[in-house]
Swiss-Prot record:
Residues 100-125 are annotated as: Disordered. This is Uncharacterized protein F1. Residues 106-115 have a biased composition (Low complexity).
Length: 135
């Protein structure tokens, strides 16, 4: 699976994203920012894996349904019923998503400690960063 816009590329479980520029309805602003970012990336990825496109993604948040379409390097979630060719400034806002690399693709060792059962990072010397016990 790969997602691409001007500034986004997702391939399989590996994420290489500089940023993703979206235009979203103002009504979606009531949702916590990180929650909305995570959900939008999830539905965009799902659509891309099926149709190899980021256009046509349907989002439904805070009672507002919108469908994505490409517009000058942005992915515009245009409200259903809005037939304008460009987003109205008072109806939409720009959202830049700069996702972080997932822990699964990180080079850091994330494992659990058998002594305290934490899932904290192991230090370079093999000691648990929570209890100090060696693995």
């Amino acid at each position: 699976m790969a997602i691409s816009t001007n500034k986004l590329f997702i391939s399989g479980s590996r994420v290489s994203i500089m940023s993703l520029e979206l235009i979203v309805p103002n009504e979606w602003n009531v949702i916590p920012r990180r929650t909305l970012e995570t959900e939008l990336l999830r539905i965009i990825s799902a659509k891309q894996s099926v149709d190899q496109t980021t256009s046509g993604v349907i989002g439904f948040y805070n009672g507002i349904v919108a469908e994505s379409r490409k517009l000058s390097g942005y992915l515009w979630f245009r409200k259903i019923g809005d037939h304008s060719k460009k987003p109205y400034v008072n109806w939409y806002q720009v959202m830049t998503i700069k996702p972080k690399e997932s822990p699964a693709t990180s080079s850091e060792d994330i494992s659990s400690c058998s002594d305290c059962d934490s899932e904290r990072l192991q230090s370079d010397d093999g000691c648990c960063s929570t209890c100090g016990e060696e693995e």
